[in-house]
């Protein structure tokens, strides 16, 4: 979204999100997806003083539930999907959905992924003008003739009688919905469809999201992704499977002091879609790593597929690299851009 706005509007754009905050091209460290209210207002002030005319902000469900963004008049809000996550905080999916829906009482236009039925929940009590995007007939901005390749996605985007072709150098089915949301935001801001598609065609991938790790001299592939929910793990493994000639190996864990309900679900998804499972740690925090792993294993049915357990993530990755064979695809899921492990209350 940031790239598209900069290319189409020739302006300076701020970014607030999980990976990093940016004021134009200057990186500002981030501690949480959406800062606390006071810090957020200070960051927005810095962006304005630096000449930013637009800000792309990732607004977490926590921030919405805790009123961190109350009073901010969003020009456009966007909805990607609603899948099980953060139930340690929200307790129920209904409460989680209701928290996300608050965004659409704060924005002028809501761009929503109509391929996820939860978009209807987002519009309950909404004060915005909705713009639906997707692959179905309900979408005002619709993807047709979608082509998935190992290194890109191509499709025709139709808006009424208008149509434009776009090729994006980021593989995966989820790129289709992400691209449509970006184009929907462009249209809500008055940017022409063809101009937005042209800009999107030059966008690069995001660090730690379906990122291929260079492995010189090796005949297997290593892929890093931030997938840490059942739905996200299903998406990345399904995408990786399309381009895997050998075995699909999944290295994953679940966060400690977080939603325990998704742990067996993650195990079940990995068991269904991967050929080899390596269950390890992913920010265990104050929980015992093996206790988390046991809850993941509870979701893995009796299977002839190899299932390895190694609570030390570094050792788990090294072990996987040793037994990987020609044409294997190794998916390191859960950490994405993170280069640390949270043990107890410390980042290691």
PLM features: residue spans?
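Walker A (P-loop) phosphate-binding motif
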Residues: 1-21, 26
């Amino acid at each position: 979204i940031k790239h598209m706005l900069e290319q189409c509007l020739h302006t300076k754009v701020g970014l607030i999100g999980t990976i990093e905050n940016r004021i134009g091209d200057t990186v500002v460290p981030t501690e949480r997806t959406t800062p606390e209210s006071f810090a957020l207002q200070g960051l927005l002030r810095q962006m304005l003083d630096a000449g930013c005319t637009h800000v792309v902000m990732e607004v977490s469900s926590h921030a919405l539930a805790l009123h961190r963004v109350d009073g901010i008049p969003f020009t456009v809000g966007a909805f990607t999907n609603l899948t099980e996550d953060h139930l340690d905080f929200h307790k129920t999916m209904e409460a989680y959905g209701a928290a996300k829906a608050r965004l659409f009482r704060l924005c002028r236009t809501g761009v929503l992924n109509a391929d996820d039925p939860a978009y209807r929940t987002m519009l309950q009590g909404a004060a915005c003008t909705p713009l639906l995007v997707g692959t179905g007939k309900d979408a005002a901005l619709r993807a047709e003739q979608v082509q998935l390749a190992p290194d890109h996605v191509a499709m025709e985007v139709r808006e009424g009688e208008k149509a434009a072709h776009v090729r994006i150098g980021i593989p995966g089915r989820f790129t289709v919905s992400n691209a449509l949301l970006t184009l929907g935001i462009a249209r809500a801001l008055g940017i022409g469809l063809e101009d937005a598609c042209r800009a999107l065609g030059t966008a690069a991938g995001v660090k730690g999201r379906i990122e291929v790790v260079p492995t010189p001299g090796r005949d297997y592939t290593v892929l890093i992704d931030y997938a840490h929910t059942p739905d996200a793990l299903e998406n990345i493994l399904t995408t990786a499977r399309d381009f895997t000639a050998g075995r699909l190996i999944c290295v994953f864990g679940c966060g400690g002091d977080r939603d325990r309900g998704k742990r067996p679900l993650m195990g079940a998804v990995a068991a269904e879609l991967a050929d080899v499972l390596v269950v390890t740690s992913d920010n265990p925090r104050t929980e015992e790593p093996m206790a988390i792993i046991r809850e993941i294993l509870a979701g893995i049915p009796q299977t002839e597929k190899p299932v390895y357990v190694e609570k030390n993530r570094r050792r788990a990755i090294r072990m996987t690299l040793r037994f990987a064979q020609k044409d294997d695809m190794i998916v390191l899921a859960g950490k994405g851009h993170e280069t640390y492990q949270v043990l107890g209350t410390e980042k290691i």
